[in-house]
Amino acid sequence: MTTTQGSGRRAALTRRPRPSLSNKLARGLWGAVWLLLFRPSPRIFHGWRRVLLRAFGARIASGALVYPSARIWAPWNLEMGAGSTLGDGVDCYSVDKVILGPRAVVSQRAYLCTASRDIDDPGLALVTAPIVLERRAWVTAEVFVGPGVTLEEGAVAAARSVVTRSVRAWTVVGGNPARPIGARPPVED
């Protein structure tokens, strides 16, 4: 179940043991904090949500935006660069690392999935791989991004795409499974 990282490929999937009791307790505590303090916070209180996420181990740069309806499974596996965004309704299943570079955007109701099951294993072992969105990458509305995917600098996944392979810089992909459908001009900061 391993593939090489790079354009059109996924990172190697890592077999994981069952979550420990401490992991389950931490996720339970985070779930309570999300429900009571994160989710009901006013839309413009991005700073408050950054504080809550950092308290649970997330590495979040100033200016990163996380909307109140975004769900983060394990904040300690989340890294967000300056100006990056997790939009409304995003589901960040961060069993492994989810890394958003500067100005990377994940739009409404997208699903970032870092884990799956090994269908070749009779016990269906949990396997994970990180998801990386490099600088200015954009996951648009309702896109599914699978384990081990990297969207290189400026790459775009068009609405409702299913992205299971990494995407080259400044390339636009769409469909199920996602395939290149265009390019966008490079942008300098």
Can you describe what each PLM-predicted range is?
Residues 141-165:
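Beta-rich strand-turn-strand
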Residues 61, 150, 168:
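Short conserved AdoMet
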Residues 40-50, 70-80, 85-150, 176-177, ...:
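Flexible, glycine/small-residue-enriched loop-and-beta-strand segment within the central core
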Residues 1-58, 62, 136, 154, ...:
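Terminal amphipathic alpha-helical/low-complexity segments used for targeting or macromolecular assembly
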Residues 169, 174-177:
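Acidic, glycine-centered active-site loop in nucleotide-sugar glycosyltransferases
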